[in-house]
From Swiss-Prot:
A zinc finger (unnamed) spans 3-34. One of its GO terms (biological process) is negative regulation of DNA-templated transcription. The lineage of its organism: Bacteria, Pseudomonadati, Pseudomonadota, Gammaproteobacteria, Candidatus Pseudothioglobaceae. It comes from the Bacteria. Transmembrane segments: none annotated. Belongs to the NrdR family. Disulfide bonds: none annotated. This is Transcriptional repressor NrdR. Binds 1 zinc ion. Keywords: ATP-binding, DNA-binding, Metal-binding, Nucleotide-binding, Repressor, Transcription, Transcription regulation, Zinc, Zinc-finger. Residues 49-139 form the ATP-cone domain. NCBIfam families: transcriptional regulator NrdR.
Amino acid sequence: MRCPFCQSDDTKVLDTRLIDDGSQVRRRRECVSCGERYSTRETVDLNLPHLIKSDDSREAFSEDKLRSGLLKALEKRPVKTSQIETSIARIELKLMTQADREVSCIKIGEWVMEELKALDKVAYIRFMSVYRQFQDIEAFKKEIDRLMR
């Protein structure tokens, strides 16, 4: 791996650790040429199924879209970045273990709601209100009452 500071190819690994429940490898590196230290993260390059959208069109799974949706729901909520990354990894694992090469966006949405429900109930309600297209306050009240039981 090239040094991000001097672009040298001559680097060495000082430390290697598993992070995010073993879904990533963090390596601490040092450039032999300039002496700068930096960290890298490695993840598996996945061949994930395509998603079937509500209009029956297909699109490739996008981790960025998944992350963006989670971050919108979790905006200004007390949830650590590491918890969000772990949730993303769990959703991707579910996606990888699907036998089908195409998965409905509805299923992805359900998985996101499961993760948000475990992380933060307010974020869960935020996401659900958009995902399920709540039309009035009664829909919010009904879901909050269901959560409180």
